[in-house]
């Protein structure tokens, strides 16, 4: 086995272990934020939505800067610093008794993610061969699902005693992850050339097709982020107990572990990436619309199952499509920019979703936020369809001219 192949194989195992630690640390804390501050402390959902949206926007919106810096200086220093910063954010969250302190803790957490997320994504693109990326992203998603349910179970158990224990556990896991990277991650370069920060960012922003695709995905993310805000609140309201939230993540884990990899393997042989992304988004959108009209936990979990199946179809295709569009000369910058849609869609989804949830509750129209999210998903589906049809038309024109 050549040294390059050996490095790729070792890199795969490193990425999987690193990803599990990050997922556990994140899901111990974040699914319980809305339960803690909305249900237990009586805050308005929009206040918590602002905090979650701020974290999302900072982490993903500034990702292009984090990626460009990583292109220049390498992955290791950015990843270690970012993980320690997230640990500090979680520690601060444990003592948050005013909205501004929760917002500050989410700001710290988001800045940490800005530093470590783009270089971690770029390492996947660097180490995994193009023909294997779809399956590897599926493995990461399966791991995300298993880690989410384990983290949510652990966090729910700790929440019975003290929310500070929840946050301390998340902080410790990120400190361990920082130590793991500091000890074992080689000083790998992310790009084929050591690209200056400004040049990497400029290269991405001039790629109009990539930027348009990324911004359109904001609508997809408005739906996707509700697993952290409105869906846990809805499950808690219908079930009457915060402990029911863990079953939502258990459903996701079961579906992902049984369906994600087989669906990815089968669909990559029969369907284009664009079609898989659009089909998943359509299922997610249609499953969102009736959520506000259900009154039983069984009906709610059925709709959540459909939502997760849509995500299982769409997410590996989205990741693979984003990676395939990245320029090898500025991988970190491209993977950072690919999170821009998540920054915008996540922020709007959290803040707007929280506001619509409060508005629907006060107006006795609980279906309002869910119908709006479904409509946004349908419009995003149509916009992506138009973009992909334009791209195919341009390709056919070039082939005819040749």
UniProtKB/Swiss-Prot annotation:
Compartments, as annotated in UniProt: Cell inner membrane
TM ranges: 13-33, 99-116, 139-159, 165-185, 214-234, 244-264, 277-297, 300-320, 340-360, 368-388
An annotated GO BP: response to antibiotic
Cytoplasmic side, ranges: 1-12, 117-138, 186-213, 265-276, 321-339, 389-402
Major site of localization recorded for this protein: membrane
Top-level taxon in the UniProt lineage: Bacteria
Membrane topology type: Multi-pass membrane protein
UniProt cross-references to Pfam families, sorted A to Z: MFS_1
Keywords for this protein: Antibiotic resistance, Cell inner membrane, Cell membrane, Membrane, Transmembrane, Transmembrane helix, Transport
Database matches in InterPro entries: MFS, MFS_dom, MFS_trans_sf, MFS_Transporters, Multidrug-R_MdtH
Recorded GO MF terms: transmembrane transporter activity
Periplasmic topology ranges: 34-98, 160-164, 235-243, 298-299, 361-367
Alphabetized PROSITE patterns for the sequence: MFS
Cited SUPFAM superfamilies: MFS general substrate transporter
One Gene Ontology cellular component annotation held by this UniProt entry: plasma membrane
Known function: Confers resistance to norfloxacin and enoxacin.
Stated family: Belongs to the major facilitator superfamily. DHA1 family. MdtH (TC 2.A.1.2.21) subfamily.
Protein name listed in UniProt: Multidrug resistance protein MdtH
Natural source organism: Escherichia coli (strain 55989 / EAEC)
Lineage of origin: Bacteria, Pseudomonadati, Pseudomonadota, Gammaproteobacteria, Enterobacterales
